[in-house]
């Protein structure tokens, strides 16, 4: 039974990324008056994650340029964005969602657009400082701060994020190594010719690429990562490590 004081919303969107933002815009174009609420776990208005591993990381664009719309857009279109207040429970049968602050919203229509979280490596030393998983603005900014004192970077994972980070680190002058479990970069998403082209490009930028190789341990000193051990017996010196090994839904 729904509580008498529960707010009712025609359209609820859980997730403030590209998909959630686009959905809110599309709904407002078709329904000019129905209440639209976007629930965001992060403290920011919806932003584009694509530049986080490229132009924003490299300092080519300002922080405000990653945001999809300015605050006035949401006010003008009466789209409510609830920041830093993630959904914690969903009752499909009763058609309501509970938020972290205890607020409950009843809904007519619900869109789940939460994306995923970076998959974590469960190996020795995973708790050391200097190991980064790129997902949000704060992750990129933490990497930027670490870059100020770094000379050597190890990227674990040769997918899109890993390749983009490796290219960026090389552009910034870091000695960069990519550790990839499979025989080729991006092997699950591109054809062999494209994979070979990307590998050649990175190598031309000075990136060392180790395929058929797995990270087995993060080695550290004074609580900070200093090297990555692999299943081939290598120990790769590192001032920072970036991990991009897929997402967990």
Where are these regions (language model features)?
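A Rossmann-like FAD-binding core segment of flavoenzymes
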Residues: 33, 81-98, 105, 172-249
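Beta1-alpha1 glycine-rich phosphate/pyrophosphate-binding loop at the start
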Residues: 7-80, 166-189, 193
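Walker A/P-loop nucleotide-binding motif
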Residues: 159-160
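Glycine-rich, highly charged phosphate/nucleotide-binding loops
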Residues: 163
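Short, flexible helix/strand-to-coil boundary loops that buttress conserved ligand/catalytic motifs
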Residues: 49-50, 125, 147, 189-190, ...
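Hydrophobic residues in beta-strands of the RecA-like P-loop NTPase core, especially within AAA+ ATPase
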Residues: 155-156, 179
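Alpha-helical scaffold segments in soluble metabolic enzymes
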Residues: 22, 26, 142, 168, ...
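FAD-binding core/adjacent interface of flavoenzyme oxidoreductases
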Residues: 1-12, 37, 70-154, 227-235, ...
